[in-house]
């Protein structure tokens, strides 16, 4: 995004920090589901939420890990494991990278759409107001761009 043309709310949605936070939430929710099914210990899912929620994801550190692993999600999971500890072994079980990436993209699109739809509602209200304000304003007729 070009900063001078971007609104802070949109920049925040598409920032690496937000992307990694969403990735964490997707992984943690998946762990909740696995715990509910008895696949992983409930205590592990709880620990993942507690320690992962408190984590400050370091974009530069994740990028550095990715340069070695050549895989964005593996780099993130490696970084996340530093915060979670031994229970990190339960994260990403039965998932593929696409499960995380596609779901994250859908979340980001939804958040961005919410902003756009609110703005469009404001634009439509302004257009309606102007249309009624000028409904009796005389204008020069035009045909094929000629007065």
Residue ranges and their predicted role:
Residues 1-147:
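A helix-coil-helix interface module used to build multimeric assemblies
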């Amino acid at each position: 995004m070009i900063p001078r043309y971007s609104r802070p709310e949109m920049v925040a949605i598409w920032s690496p920090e937000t992307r990694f936070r969403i990735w964490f939430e997707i992984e943690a929710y998946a762990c909740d589901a696995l715990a509910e099914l008895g696949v992983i210990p409930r205590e592990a899912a709880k620990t993942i939420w507690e320690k992962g929620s408190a984590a400050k994801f370091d974009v530069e550190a994740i990028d550095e890990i990715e340069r070695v692993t050549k895989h964005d999600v593996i780099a993130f999971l490696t970084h996340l494991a530093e915060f979670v500890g031994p229970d990190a072994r339960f994260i990403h079980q039965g998932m593929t990278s696409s499960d995380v990436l596609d779901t994250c993209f859908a979340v980001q699109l939804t958040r961005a759409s919410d902003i756009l739809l609110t703005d469009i509602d404001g634009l439509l209200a302004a257009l309606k107001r102007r249309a009624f304000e000028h409904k009796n304003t005389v204008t020069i007729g035009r045909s094929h761009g000629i007065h």
